[in-house]
Amino acid sequence: LVRSPGVYFSEDHDTGSGRPLASAKLIPYRGAWMEFETSNRDVIYVKLDRKRKTPVSTLLRTLGYETNEEILELFEDVDNNPDHKFIETTIAKDSGVTTKDEALIEFYRRLRPGEPPNAENAQALIESLFFDSRRYDLGKVGRYKLESNLKGLKFQEIDGSTRILSKEDIVSLLRRLIQINNSEKRANDIDHLGNRRVRAVGELIQNQVRVGFLRMERVIRERMTIQVDPETTTPAALINVRPVVAAVREFFGGSQL
């Protein structure tokens, strides 16, 4: 019994004022998690792949919303509480990052600490984590739950069969988060049985076979760099099925089933 993919909103209450502080988890069927939280100082943070948190305005800049005006315009109809301006406060917290390249480098530092950052590598990393169907998959259930939770918030409709994230998904999620912070919407119960599902044996085997194919692909790519003569190289010299066989044996020999 595992948690279904999708977006889940929850809320804590500030101990001083008692007002709600919303958070959200975007859980894919396969891939990196994206988590959002609101501080008691009205700053909204995001954590990618469970790494260090960053003001969400940095994430929005990596998606192409580069100026403060563009970011504020996305939320002007929901971030309208005069006492709590979440996006303005978040931008002020993130005053050191003002361009897309700076935002990309900031994320790269947090996701790959110790490696020399540059904007090109950072862009490739962000795209591979959340916008590449080979590494990220919401699943049909995840896409359905995402759409049902964010109904009426999107300024651009997304094809229901799309199983990777879009920047519209992220903006709409943040719009809902602000509504919960303003007590205009309610959070959902992440632990409700309706948000759980049974992971069948076939699905477990499928995931393990996928791991085997990825290992086999890596071996093939390595051999292709070594084999210098494409005229004499044959498929049999490049392809080795042992990683797939080993992955399946590993499942049947070591799985809790």
Predicted segments, located by residue:
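N-terminal non-catalytic structural scaffold regions of very large proteins
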Residues: 1-256
